[in-house]
């Protein structure tokens, strides 16, 4: 909008759109509802922030195929959840054209969807990739940090345990991961919307962060800092890990996006600011 673009927000009406936008109310899971809300509108670019399943992707592909010249879907680093690589993972490690799609899985079951988040995104990517004429981009987003409205509570999880002296559950071999700041991914999506490339692209700041480095940044933010607090880790079995701890190594290589022209920041440089943004005065 700051650049003079007209922005249309489509949601179910449960939350108000930003001021100055055009607001359409529709259920994206209902193809007729979406078609009716859109009418004859067309768009230069569609940015899909809430596509979690292949069923949703099928509907979106049919509805927007004749309505947009570019479709940008926010995907996730979790499409690589089965990788375990000593090197940062490139986009070709998961080729959406080779991913099997199963529309009969219980994608409408919230519990199933929660435990199959990465699989849902993989199959959604595959639906878009199956149509060679559909101009899609899937932005595989690293773990996001920063901002004052983190509804996940993942950094709070660590801060509370550090303050209480409670052990933090991690895998016996705990791998580092790639991250991106919330403002950086917003900039990336805006950049991707205006480019011409297609297909999957990784979005991650330069460098990896360990669970220990996250905890060190949190400790520095606590009153008294490292002189009063220290993170304690406890190795546990699969299924009990704390957030941002990983038994497999699948940090993302950002070389493709860099070659295409996007300039990433360095995770270690923005991490202290991200901690301050998210925790604010809550730890005082």
Region spans (language model):
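Conserved C-terminal active-site "lid" loop/helix of NAD(P)H-dependent oxidoreductases
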Residues: 182, 212, 237-264
């Amino acid at each position: 909008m700051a650049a003079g673009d007209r922005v249309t927000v489509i949601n179910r009406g449960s939350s108000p759109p930003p001021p100055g936008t055009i607001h359409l109310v529709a259920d994206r899971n209902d193809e007729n509802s979406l078609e009716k809300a859109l009418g004859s509108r067309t768009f230069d670019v569609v940015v899909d922030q809430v596509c979690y399943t292949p069923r949703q992707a099928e509907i979106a592909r049919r509805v927007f195929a004749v309505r947009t010249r570019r479709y940008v879907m926010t995907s996730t680093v979790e499409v690589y959840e089965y990788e375990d690589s000593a090197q940062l993972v490139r986009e070709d490690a998961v080729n959406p054209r080779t991913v099997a799609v199963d529309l009969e899985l219980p994608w409408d079951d919230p519990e199933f969807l929660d435990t199959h988040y990465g699989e849902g995104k993989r199959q959604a990517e595959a639906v878009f990739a199956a149509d060679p004429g559909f101009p899609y981009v899937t932005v595989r987003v690293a773990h996001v940090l920063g901002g004052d409205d983190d509804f996940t509570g993942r950094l709070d999880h660590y801060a509370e345990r550090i303050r209480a002296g409670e052990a933090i559950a991690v895998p016996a071999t705990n791998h580092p991961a790639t991250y991106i700041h919330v403002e950086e991914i917003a900039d990336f999506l805006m950049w991707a919307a205006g480019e011409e490339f297609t297909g999957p692209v990784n979005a991650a700041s330069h460098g990896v962060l360990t669970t220990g480095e996250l905890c060190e940044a949190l400790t520095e933010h606590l009153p008294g800092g490292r002189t009063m607090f220290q993170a304690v880790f406890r190795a546990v079995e699969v299924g009990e890990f704390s957030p941002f701890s990983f038994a497999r190594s699948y940090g993302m290589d950002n070389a493709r996006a860099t070659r295409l022209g996007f300039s990433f920041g360095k995770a270690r440089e923005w991490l202290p600011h991200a901690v301050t943004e998210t925790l604010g005065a809550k730890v005082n």
